């Protein structure tokens, strides 16, 4: 169960970072 929780946390962190980078690129392109 611990491994599943850590994997889910890692996946969530990766998704958050990817979204932040994607939004950042969109803002740069918008400017």
UniProtKB/Swiss-Prot annotation:
The 4 large subunits of the cytochrome b6-f complex are cytochrome b6, subunit IV (17 kDa polypeptide, PetD), cytochrome f and the Rieske protein, while the 4 small subunits are PetG, PetL, PetM and PetN. The complex functions as a dimer. The chain crosses the membrane at residues 4-24. It is found in: Plastid, Chloroplast thylakoid membrane. Component of the cytochrome b6-f complex, which mediates electron transfer between photosystem II (PSII) and photosystem I (PSI), cyclic electron flow around PSI, and state transitions. PetL is important for photoautotrophic growth as well as for electron transfer efficiency and stability of the cytochrome b6-f complex. The lineage of its organism: Eukaryota, Viridiplantae, Streptophyta, Embryophyta, Tracheophyta. PANTHER family: CYTOCHROME B6-F COMPLEX SUBUNIT 6. Keywords: Chloroplast, Electron transport, Membrane, Photosynthesis, Plastid, Thylakoid, Transmembrane, Transmembrane helix, Transport. Belongs to the PetL family. GO terms for cellular component: chloroplast thylakoid membrane; cytochrome b6f complex. GO terms for biological process: photosynthesis. Pfam families: PetL (PF05115). It is a single-pass membrane protein. One of its GO terms (molecular function) is electron transporter, transferring electrons within cytochrome b6/f complex of photosystem II activity. Disulfide bonds: none annotated. This is Cytochrome b6-f complex subunit 6.
């Amino acid at each position: 169960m611990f491994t599943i929780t850590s994997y889910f946390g890692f996946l969530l962190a990766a998704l958050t970072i990817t979204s932040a980078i994607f939004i950042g690129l969109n803002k740069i392109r918008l400017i």
